[in-house]
């Protein structure tokens, strides 16, 4: 039996089938992973590229490519069962402005596995510009504005009811289509506000199994392939993911593939 956002994974081994019962919550099944990416080839490539793109847009393009190549990391746990998500989607946090009191909003971007880097970057840029528009609310902002007008006890009752319906896979598509907490991963760029990457918890609401945080670009000592030590520009990326969706070896090889795409962005040129 499937859901409107994924299909039940068949042929799951007994241990993996047991994991949701042994670790019923996402935050009880967290794995932390960190990468330091060498940007010595990346930044000149970005500067020379026309039309211009940002490191964040490049990262999203790399993630889209990896998620299309390694489908097991596009799975999620719901109702104690393992599902294969039927789309590649990433949720993005956007601050309306650099003012510390400016509101933060979230948007969900859906991509096609055949998207080129140009397709992905254009999509991300459009969504971020729309989210920054103070005069225009995102779908999630409209929904939250309506719900938060209700009494607290009623909000909690609604959330509990929705989680119960979601457990049985009966939530209608319109309730999850634009919800940022129903996506392949949450991708946050703390580097855009000058901060280092941090580990973030997973949300028990929704079904996101990955949280990915990019830090600021900085200089750091790096040992090259020739064994020589040099100072290069790097970025740290920290991941939090639900180990119940697939094994650690599969996940780590997928994330190392992402490293290859960011450190050698020419690999993303052309169609997948």
Q: Residues of each region from the PLM?
A:
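C-terminal catalytic/motor cores of large multi-domain enzyme assemblies
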Residues: 1-272
């Amino acid at each position: 039996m499937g859901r409107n956002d994924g299909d039940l994974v068949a042929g799951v081994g007994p241990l993996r089938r047991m994991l949701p019962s042994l670790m019923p919550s996402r935050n009880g099944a967290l794995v932390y992973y960190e990468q330091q990416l060498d940007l010595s080839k990346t930044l000149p490539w970005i500067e020379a590229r026309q039309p211009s793109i940002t490191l964040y847009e490049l990262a999203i393009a790399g993630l889209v490519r990896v998620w299309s190549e390694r489908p097991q990391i596009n799975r999620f746990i719901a109702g104690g069962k393992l599902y294969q998500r039927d789309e590649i989607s990433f949720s993005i946090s956007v601050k309306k402005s650099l003012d510390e009191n400016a509101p933060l909003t979230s948007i969900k971007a859906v991509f096609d596995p055949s998207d080129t880097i140009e397709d992905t970057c254009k999509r991300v840029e459009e969504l971020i510009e729309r989210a920054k528009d103070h005069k225009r609310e995102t779908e999630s902002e409209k929904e939250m504005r309506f719900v938060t007008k209700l009494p607290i006890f009623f909000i909690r009752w609604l959330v509990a009811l929705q989680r119960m319906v979601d457990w049985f896979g009966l939530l209608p598509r319109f309730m999850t289509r634009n919800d940022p907490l129903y996506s392949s991963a949450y991708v946050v760029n703390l580097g855009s506000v000058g901060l280092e990457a941090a580990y973030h918890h997973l949300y028990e609401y929704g079904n996101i199994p990955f949280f990915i945080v990019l830090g600021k670009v900085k200089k750091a000592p790096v040992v090259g392939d020739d064994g020589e030590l040099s100072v290069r520009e790097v970025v740290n990326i920290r991941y939090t993911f639900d180990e119940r969706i697939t094994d650690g070896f599969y996940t780590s090889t997928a994330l190392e593939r992402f490293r290859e795409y960011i450190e050698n962005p020419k690999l993303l040129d052309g169609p997948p």
